[in-house]
Amino acid sequence: ALPNQQTVDYPSFKSNYNFEKPFLYLAR
């Protein structure tokens, strides 16, 4: 899930974003 992905439903988006945060940090 990416922050600019507006079409996903919010609960799963938030869940996926929180899960991927460390990976996004490592990959920036």
From Swiss-Prot:
Keywords: GTP-binding, Nucleotide-binding, Nucleus, Protein transport, Transport. GO terms for biological process: protein transport. GO terms for molecular function: GTP binding. GO terms for cellular component: nucleus. It is found in: Nucleus. Its main location: nucleus. Belongs to the small GTPase superfamily. Ran family. GTP-binding protein involved in nucleocytoplasmic transport. Required for the import of protein into the nucleus and also for RNA export. Involved in chromatin condensation and control of cell cycle. Found in a nuclear export complex with RanGTP, exportin and pre-miRNA. This is GTP-binding nuclear protein Ran. It comes from Populus euphratica (Euphrates poplar). The lineage of its organism: Eukaryota, Viridiplantae, Streptophyta, Embryophyta, Tracheophyta.
